[in-house]
Amino acid sequence: MGCNRNCGLIAGAVIGAVLAVFGGILMPVGDMLIEKTIKKEVVLEEGTIAFKNWVKTGTDVYRQFWIFDVQNPDEVTVNSSKIKVKQRGPYTYRVRYLAKENITQDPETHTVSFLQPNGAIFEPSLSVGTEDDTFTILNLAVAAAPQLYPNTFMQGILNSFIKKSKSSMFQNRTLKELLWGYTDPFLNLVPYPITTTIGVFYPYNNTADGIYKVFNGKDDISKVAIIDTYKGRKNLSYWSSYCDLINGTDAASFPPFVEKTRVLQFFSSDICRSIYAVFGAEINLKGIPVYRFILPSFAFASPFQNPDNHCFCTEKIISKNCTLYGVLDIGKCKEGKPVYISLPHFLHGSPELAEPIESLSPNEEEHSTYLDVEPITGFTLRFAKRLQVNMLVKPAKKIEALKNLKHNYIVPILWLNETGTIGDEKAEMFRNQVTGKINLLGLVEIVLLSVGVVMFIAFMISYCACRSKRVN
């Protein structure tokens, strides 16, 4: 009888040890299986989960616009007063709903090339008004004239066309005209072969961004989705040194197994440069753990604050010898037009940027850019890209519409918020196919290890106690 009991206790201890060992072995083996599966499914080729969502995003992406409506145009034109603006919006468009085109795999370089077609559909139910709403805004053509034609003789000639067209420093335009283009009356009179249609995003509809060539990750998963070339080049020709390089992905996804210490680099054609995001917080998005990466203030810092930005300073006067921060001159990639990009309301910008503009109120929560990235797959499941489009206007003695200005203005035209969040159906699918299976495997590992250890200890204690009793 004693033998049977001892044998049973020993058998229980052995079973517990086996369970514990199996649970311990399952941890690295399970992690290896997960890694192998993820590496297979994030490759950009036919048949993978990543490829299906990469060709055409399953997430609804919206671009909201807020327009800075100028309230005192005459005061500014005559007296060079502060510009009083009233923010109006949001006006919402659905974007990025078209599938990638001309997708071509290159098995030799392990890359895939494509075009991303552009399109925008107005969403009245998500907007405060219609595309026909009218705003008083800076006259884009008149403001650009002194920058494009610094020669005073040329400015005198242009002034005659400006006067004849009855153009001034400010103009009234509908939302549709401002965003997507209108025939400018001043430019229409210029007898040179120039583009007479102008708009903040003109041309956009029926155009395409690219050609992009990105690594498909088949030979090296750490390079998946990273851009190899853009429009056939590895650099942009807008900046000097390393600032001109095209780095990272397009921010829709990143190589898998993202760590908090990683700096996520991505390229944005909207701002004509590569940029980066750093870890901010852990967040739960529809039951999926994600890492929030934020665009740091250092990204638009002056070279004095962040020496790495020295090659983004392209001139010394407007930038006040490269000390101005929070704004980026992208004129070189806008055909020389004096276009400046910043965060909305000059968030993280030099105080002198907002000083000549009334009614700006920068807010970190509303105006910062972030990416919510699922760390195992590297997929971006939610994002908010926020930026402001500004235009420089300078005094010009030979142009009557600008001759009374006493100083330069970097005038905010509009700011946008482009957002996308994984839908409920896609989130459930993601939980079932990825996070759910990983969590289940982790639970099985812990249960096996815990139960095995408890069984082994309990049966061994019982066995030792039984033997001690027999000896006594």
UniProtKB/Swiss-Prot annotation:
Major localisation: membrane
Cited InterPro entries: CD36/SCARB1/SNMP1, CD36_fam
Positions annotated with a glycan in the UniProt record: 79, 102, 172, 205, 235, 247, 321, 417
Disulphide linkage map: 243-311, 272-333, 313-322
Bilayer-spanning residue ranges: 8-29, 440-461
Keyword Oxidoreductase assigned: no
GO CC terms: apical plasma membrane; brush border membrane; caveola; cell surface; Golgi apparatus; membrane; membrane raft
Reported modifications of this chain: Palmitoylated by ZDHHC5. Palmitoylation is required for proper localization at the plasma membrane. Ubiquitinated at Lys-469. Ubiquitination is induced by fatty acids such as oleic acid and leads to degradation by the proteasome. Ubiquitination and degradation are inhibited by insulin which blocks the effect of fatty acids.
Protein name, as recorded: Platelet glycoprotein 4
Gene that produces this protein: CD36
